[in-house]
Amino acid sequence: MPRRRVIGQRKILPDPKFGSELLAKFVNILMVDGKKSTAEAIVYTALETLAQRSGKDHLEAFEVALDNVRPTVEVKSRRVGGSTYQVPVEVRPVRRNALAMRWIVDAARKRGDKSMALRLANELSDAVENKGSAVKKREDVHRMAEANKAFAHYRW
């Protein structure tokens, strides 16, 4: 293993329309085959729809949706004496955002609406109202962590 300096994380450029780094990251997660302009168009259309529905500012509604999907704890597998335990660990802030965005995009892709922009808008509006697949995913992860709280002392 090389012992050179640790390379820092790349700085992500904020998105051009709203100037938000979170939104730029979200666009990158949604992007398929390097088609960034298509991903941006989908996200901006979805945010327009979301803002009209919720009556909030675009970014504010997006933040609320993300907040409702962010996990605080998750489980990680840990081998102890030949058996594997699901150990609950706290999620780092950067990973919280990444997981929330990934779950929202995955849930939107699984929906049956016409366009991706509409699917994303519906999933985001569900997340704002604390319902939908992405919120259910977070609750499942929290439930797993709660069920395995007895193994918390195996944290590393």
From Swiss-Prot:
GO MF, one annotated term: tRNA binding
Keyword terms, alphabetized: Ribonucleoprotein, Ribosomal protein, RNA-binding, rRNA-binding, tRNA-binding
| Pfam families (UniProt xref) | Ribosomal_S7 (PF00177)
Q: Does the keyword Coiled coil apply?
A: no
Q: Which cysteines are joined by disulfide bonds?
A: none
Superkingdom is Bacteria
Q: Which InterPro entries match?
A: Ribosomal_uS7, Ribosomal_uS7_bac/org-type, Ribosomal_uS7_CS, Ribosomal_uS7_dom, Ribosomal_uS7_dom_sf
PROSITE patterns xref list: RIBOSOMAL_S7
Q: Which CDD domains match?
A: uS7_Bacteria (cd14869)
Q: Which GO terms describe its cellular component?
A: small ribosomal subunit
**Listed GO biological process terms:** translation
The protein's matches in HAMAP family, at most eight in alphabetical order, are given as: Ribosomal_uS7_B
Q: What does this protein do?
A: One of the primary rRNA binding proteins, it binds directly to 16S rRNA where it nucleates assembly of the head domain of the 30S subunit. Is located at the subunit interface close to the decoding center, probably blocks exit of the E-site tRNA.
Q: Which PANTHER family does its entry note?
A: RIBOSOMAL PROTEIN S7 (PTHR11205)
Entry's family note: Belongs to the universal ribosomal protein uS7 family.
Task: Spell out the subunit comment.
Answer: Part of the 30S ribosomal subunit. Contacts proteins S9 and S11.
Name of the protein in question: Small ribosomal subunit protein uS7
Which organism does this record belong to? Answer: Serratia proteamaculans (strain 568)
Gene for this chain? rpsG
